[in-house]
Amino acid sequence: MISQLESLKKFSSVVADTGDIDSIQKFSPDDCTTNPSLIFKAVQSNKYKKLFDEVLANSKSRKFNKLNDQVDYIADQLAIAFGIELTKIIPGYVSTEVDSDLSFNTEATVEKAKQIINSYEQSGVPRNRILIKIAGTWEGIQAIKQLEAEGISCNCTLIFSLTQAVACAEAGAFLISPFVGRILDWFKANSSKDYDATNDPGVESVEKIYNYFKKYNYNTIVMAASFR
C-alpha cells in the first residue's frame, strides 16, 4: 500500500526541515532546509560528534578577537558541515540560514551570505546546490535582491502575509517559505474560533500567495513550511 508521503511526492516536491541526517536518508526528500535550532538539536546526539569535533578543532586553529566571534564561526561552520553532508544524500537544494541577528542589516546579510557560499564552494559544493535562507524583513529582502542579481539563490523565510511574499518575488527570490503553522498558532491564540483542515488560516494564506503568483506570472517557488 502506498504511503501518504509517496502520495504527496506525486503532486509536490518534499522538503525536509531537519538536521537529522539519518531521517533524511530514511525519507528521501527532494530538498532540505536547516536552521540553527535544528543544527543545535542534532549535535546533541553522539551520532554527529565527529562532525562537531572537526568543526571545533578547526576553530581552535584560528585566531579570534572575541569569544563571540569564535562562537559565531563555529555556528556557521556547523551549518555548512551539515549542509555538505546533506548535499551527498539529496538530489536538490540545501537551504542554509544567515544568522537571524542580521535580519535588519542588509550589508551584513549580504556579506554573511557570500561567506557561506564561498565556504561551500571551497568544499566542492557548487552554489547551484545551495539556497541562502534570509528572513523576509525589508532589509532582508533588499539583501536578497542584491544576492540574486549576483547569482546567489535565496530562500526568503518567515513569510506571514501576501504583501511580504510579493515583495520577495519582486526582489527576485528563488523561493519563499510561508509559515503555515505559525499563522495558525497566532489565530488560535487570538481568537475563540475553532480551526481544522477546512478553515486553517495558514493554509488559506499560502493558497492566496500561490494563486497570486500564478496569476501575475512570478517564477518564485512557494514552499509552504512550519506545518503543525
Please annotate each region the language model reported.
Residues 82, 87-88, 118, 141-150, ...:
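Alpha-helix-loop-beta-strand connector modules within alpha/beta enzyme cores
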Residues 35, 96, 132, 147, ...:
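Conserved, mostly hydrophobic/aromatic
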Residues 19-21, 37, 99-103, 135-137, ...:
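Active-site beta-loop-alpha junctions enriched in small/polar residues
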Residues 38-41, 46-137:
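Active-site beta->alpha loop and helix N-cap motifs at the rims of alpha/beta catalytic domains
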Residues 13-15, 31-33, 93-95, 129-133, ...:
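Structural preference for beta-strand elements that scaffold enzyme active sites
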Residues 155, 160-228:
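Catalytic alpha/beta core domains of metabolic enzymes, predominantly
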Residues 1-19:
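N- or domain-start disorder-to-order transition segments that initiate the globular core
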Residues 28-31, 143-154, 170-176:
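Glycine-enriched alpha-helix->loop->beta-strand junction motifs that scaffold or abut catalytic
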